[in-house]
Swiss-Prot record:
InterPro entries: TGT, TGT-like_sf, tRNA_ribo_trans-like
Residues holding substrate: 90-94, 144, 189, 215
Organism: Helicobacter pylori (strain G27)
Family: Belongs to the queuine tRNA-ribosyltransferase family.
Protein's pathway: tRNA modification; tRNA-queuosine biosynthesis
Protein name from the UniProt record: Queuine tRNA-ribosyltransferase
Length: 371
């Protein structure tokens, strides 16, 4: 993997990430395709309509169903899903904790039960890499020990030491495999305790292809989250991409870009779309509300997305009320277009050394009105 920094504006960074299946301009927002697809959308939607170059798939879900060996036999994730961009896959640790309800944490891995059939499974640092090799992920995440917030200091320290140990074991295992097209990212933990974040960085080896800031958006305040990012990002290698996991709102993303983060993922644009909330530059609207029943205008004037160029708010209001599946597709296309355009415009602003003024103008308009 090759990562080139093209511009730095204060702390905000613009770069190019060269992966086996695509070149990705950063900052980048990665749509979340848990089961190998973004809910209600297919590969054509992602490539030809949205122009997405990098999407996230979930190791835990692909391992349990259809099984990583099935995906491998069918040509890997890219051929299986017919998506010709790149895939980042997470380690599955978060889902093992959040979905199984019966997790046993051990020094060498995680024992969990499938949320599908109750069968027992064991994830180790090497096991999750083997799964991701079978998926042929462009970017693989290490197994880490997740902690919900708030958490006692002792638990945070235990988490970062275990996560660093697993990350370093993963790196050693990965080096033995000699698979240059499957890149490995470490995950920095430590909650909102800044000394714990520093210790996590210190304990994690420096030979990874990229570094993620994990363990945020799990119960802390926005101010605590931003303080943690501001402290952690400068500690990471400057020549490697920085990934903020599972965040978030447009405000969160722009704030994190200003603090030096390059990569983001979140279910928010698609989940909100399915629940009638649509993003516009003037704030969010709830398309199920009665005033949109006769509104013949697009979701947003001057929006170039597939839905806005063709359909009215009244039509989307009708589709949502009628529970038509087409609603989820059109709404998701709009919200993902909004997010992808936002980070694209943020990148252009960084290249032109005007990011802070772009961010200020964007957020002033975004907060001006929500319906």
């Amino acid at each position: 993997m090759d990562f080139q920094l093209q511009a730095i504006d204060k702390h905000a960074r613009a770069g190019l990430l060269n992966l086996a299946h695509s070149q990705v301009a950063t900052p980048v927002f990665m749509p979340v395709g848990t089961q190998g697809c973004i809910k209600s959308l297919d590969a054509m939607d992602m490539q030809e309509i949205l122009g997405a170059k990098l999407i996230l798939a979930n190791t835990y879900h692909m391992y349990l169903r259809p099984g990583e060996k099935v995906v491998e036999q069918l040509g890997g994730l890219h051929r299986f899903a017919q998506f010709h961009g790149s895939f980042l896959t997470d380690s599955g640790g978060f889902q093992a904790f959040s979905l199984s309800g019966n997790v046993k944490l051990q020094e060498d891995g995680i024992v969990f039960k499938s949320h599908i059939d109750g069968s027992k499974h064991f994830f180790t640092p090497a096991k999750v890499l083997d799964i991701q090799y079978s998926l042929n992920s462009d970017i693989m995440m290490v197994l880490d020990d997740l902690v919900g917030l708030p958490a006692p200091l002792k638990r945070l320290e235990e988490s970062i030491k275990r996560s660093a140990k697993w990350a370093n074991l993963s790196l050693e295992y990965h080096k033995e495999k000699n698979r240059p097209n499957n890149n490995l990212f470490a995950i920095i933990q430590g909650g909102t305790h800044l000394k714990m974040r520093s210790l996590s960085v210190e304990l994690t080896h420096k030979g990874f292809d990229g570094y993620a800031i994990g363990g945020l958006a799990v119960g802390e305040s926005v101010d605590e989250m931003l303080e943690t990012i501001a402290h952690t990002a400068p500690l990471l290698p400057k020549d490697k991409p920085r990934y903020l996991m599972g965040v978030g709102t447009p405000e969160n993303i722009l704030d994190a870009i200003s603090l030096g983060v390059d990569m983001f993922d979140c279910v928010m644009p698609t989940r909100n779309a399915r629940n009638a909330t649509l993003f516009t530059h003037s704030g969010k609207i709830s398309i199920k509300n009665a005033p949109y029943k006769l509104d013949n205008t697009p979701i947003e004037e001057n929006c170039a997305c597939y839905a806005c160029k063709r359909y009215s708010k009244a039509y989307l209001h009708h589709l949502f009320r009628a529970k038509e599946l087409t609603y989820a597709r059109l709404a998701s296309l709009h919200n993902l277009h909004f997010y992808l355009e936002m980070v694209k415009n943020a990148r252009n602003a960084i290249l032109e050394k005007r990011f802070l003024s772009f961010k200020k103008e964007f957020l002033e308009k975004y907060h001006s009105c929500s319906h």
